[in-house]
Amino acid sequence: MRRIEIVLGELERLTRGLCLADLAQETAFTAEAIGFNLGLARNSVSKDLNQLWNDGLAIKSRGRPVYFLHRQALETLLGRQLEESEREVRSVADVLPHEEHYAPDDPFTSLIGYDRSLRDAVEKGRAAVLYPHGLHVLLTGPSGVGKTFFAELMHRFACEQASGAIPPLVYFNCAEYAHNPELLSSHLFGHRQGAFTGANEHKTGLVEQADGGYLLLDEVHRLSYEGQEKLFSILDKGEYRPLGVSSQPRSISVRLICATTEPVGSALLRTFQRRIQVCIDLPGIHQRSVEEQIELIVGFLQRESRKIERTVSIDKPLLLWLLNKPLEGNIGQLKSDIQFLCAQAWASGMTEHNDTLQLDKRLAEMSVNPTPEQRLLVDTLFEGKARLNIDARTLPALKTSLATGAEIEESDLFYSFLTREYVNLRNSNVPPAETLAILKNKLSSIFEYGLYSRDSVAHPPRYGDQIEERVTLLIGCVEQVLGFSLPENLVNPLRKHFLALIGYVQRGLIPQLYSSSLILDRCKDEYDNATLLCRKINELLHIQCPATEVVWLCLFLKECRHYRQRIDASPDCGVILIAHGATTATSQAQYVNRVLERELFSAIDMPFEQSVHDTLETLTQMIQTRQYRRLILLVDIGSLIHFGSTISKLFQIDVLLMPNITLTSLLEVGLDLSYETSDLPQLTALLQSKNIPCQLCTPQQENGGKVLVISCITGMGTAEKIKKVLEESFGELMSQDTRMVILDYNEVRSLERVQQALNASERLAGIVGTFQPGLPDIPFISLEELFSEQGPELVLSLLTPDLSNAERRLEMERSAMRFISALTMESIINHISVLNPQRILKEMEGVFNHLTSSLSLKPSRQVTLRFLIHCCCMVERIVINRKPLQMALESQPNLDARAFSVIKSAFLPIEDAYAIRLSDAEYFYIYELLYS
């Protein structure tokens, strides 16, 4: 074969490995790159390529260096014949077809994600504007997703479509007058002079100002139901009346755009919802694709670049941190965070006089564990560089780069990436050694992304029976080498890879590239097994297995062994980390798991607003679900250190508790579990020998007991009464392991002084008192909370934090009535002087139980308390005065006659026992009390 034919074949092979996105990125091939692949001199290859161009078999670009593409392969890719004028082009991208976009005057195109995650939202917004006379719109989504910005885009789009006057956009935040319906009416609809006190002149409302345009009602959920109903006439008929006007209503042409962060069903009237024709839900930032998140970050950095008139430079770790940072405020919070990062960098570099603002990982608050997709796209974006420089021209080029990384849809990501990346690097004149180093760094990320992408989990299409049988035999060979069967989530991507490999080899798309340095260090022990499997591929699939397949097989075999290790690593022994903070435990566990290359640690985060009981409930559910028979529990501070004995008693298992955990001790435990022992007594001794604090909790250990401290600033007398109420209500639960201690308020403010009141083996369960003493992580119940609806439940959470939700509900039913009785007794003792308080209270409880059962009532604790106190005092009043309350009753058309009759019947035993008669007025008051 002549040299020119070899060059033509290589050019065709390389061109067929391209896609349209590559052409958009100006990807083509130089004489040097082709010469490197074939081992030929650059000048000889250049001569042959120019001859091929003269013969019409290749096209080339003008400029230096000169790029070439195979003409027929390019026409196949484009799906059209090239014109004669296109034999030589200014740039490779010139041969691409013109893409269809929205008209350039469409404001929605400035919205990142308008053609992807926000496509449905944009189409709904455009439809609402374009429909004759427009449609009303409800925008929903969490805070900070850009609802106001979306409404402004709708208005700008309406302005572009308007043939006459520009429609106005009037903004109103419904929270401003949420609690004053009259001022709300005046502000929205206007008022006439004299409509109310202080209305000295006519006022135009926002509705009239928005006539012919849009009224944006932000935070519409803050409107009361009455406020929502005031808008019905506009929504239904396009009419309204200013405040104080009773004449003919005024016609109006206004479209409402309502925005809310709350669930629509709970915040808005159903009758209000159905009057709004279009509902648009905007997703949170972490529901957007990774490429959109990167575009948002770069867009905000580009905005700061224009503001400060400098290039902004960011490194890879900081960009990954921004992608993984928890953002409760979504896009709005991201914008503020980026502004703050730029301000920090500006302040730290004020003494330096350069044109670049440097942002780097030192500004990040914590380490992150990025996903393979994030690493892939960020690697694609940085193109092997250490930093990304952002200025006014960055975003358009970035979108093309991200599209290349995100749209890889070929049947096998590994080889499609390898081919494309290799070609790009060689065309960039990167030396061979550096090319291998760059590829090696990226292969692990691309492998993980391809293996665990959602597309890989789905069932791939089936091929001919003969090929399927051979691929199945190959999978069996892999399982034989590994020594265990593969789960379906690994079989599917393996099968898909083998089927794709056949096509790539037959089309000659795999570059003749191989070096042992491409195999990651952690995978080199799988080299012999991978080589054996390559021979099996040659034998079963009848193809020449490329040397690069050894690299993929090494990665796959190592991942399978890690998977097996995660499954087999003491499945009966859980290792759980709990730490204060929204993501502290998760971040630390992910970091250590990545270092150890196994999923060893599970994490439970404890945000600031989460209670100790809720955290314990999460822990117990995790243990129940995973059926652990042993547990290693790692915690940081506070009440979490008591979870060890609680879990040990609750599940009757051994628990190794490690308090005051740090990242260093986490790594130490992980290494010991991986390479030393998972036996808890042996592990305890090993850790203690390294001076790492730990404690082995067993079910047989005696519980040291709990102490509940009661303290009132009003004096010891009040504290004694509270103690008495709690003993009568929850005495059975306290048994021998809980005691109550009364302390002066000044003593409670110091944790050291509180500890002095405890025995060495006791722990502080919580504090009940007047004011919050401010002790860190010590549960506190105020008197207001104690006597509220949630009072008994709060006390139960202190005394029995290890109860399940079902057990807690059962105990609540038992204790709630005793709690109410105890409170009622304390109250009626102060008001009853003639009757026996215990007797009358017991009788009234019987009446109350009869009423709730007969009338199917579920009254609140407040209603129960009021009923018992009122009825006990009522009976004593009638006994002393010898006559009931006498008052004229108005006609009550809504009175439930049956319920009224049941109430009368229930009090007959009381009337007989105390020789009294209750009037209808007394019964009516009791009726109102129960049904209020």
From Swiss-Prot:
Keywords: Activator, ATP-binding, DNA-binding, Kinase, Nucleotide-binding, Phosphoprotein, Phosphotransferase system, Repeat, Transcription, Transcription regulation, Transferase. SUPFAM superfamilies: P-loop containing nucleoside triphosphate hydrolases (SSF52540), PTS system fructose IIA component-like (SSF53062), PTS-regulatory domain, PRD (SSF63520). It comes from Salmonella typhimurium (strain 14028s / SGSC 2262). Residues 111-343 form the Sigma-54 factor interaction domain. The lineage of its organism: Bacteria, Pseudomonadati, Pseudomonadota, Gammaproteobacteria, Enterobacterales. PROSITE patterns: PRD_2 (PS51372), PTS_EIIA_TYPE_4 (PS51096), SIGMA54_INTERACT_4 (PS50045). The gene is dgaR. InterPro entries: AAA+_ATPase (IPR003593), P-loop_NTPase (IPR027417), PRD (IPR011608), PRD_sf (IPR036634), PTS_EIIA_man-typ (IPR004701), PTS_EIIA_man-typ_sf (IPR036662), Sigma_54_int (IPR002078). Its EC number is 2.7.1.-. Pfam families: PRD, Sigma54_activat. One of its GO terms (cellular component) is membrane. The active site is at residue 580. This is Transcriptional regulatory protein DagR. Residues 462-567, 835-932 form the PRD domain. The PTS EIIA type-4 domain may serve a regulatory function, through its phosphorylation activity. Involved in the regulation of the catabolism of D-glucosaminate. ATP binds at residues 141-148, 210-219. Gene3D superfamilies: P-loop containing nucleotide triphosphate hydrolases, Phosphotransferase system, mannose-type IIA component, PRD domain. It comes from the Bacteria. The modification Phosphohistidine is found at residues 497, 870. Disruption phenotype: Cells lacking this gene are unable to grow with D-glucosaminate as the sole carbon source.
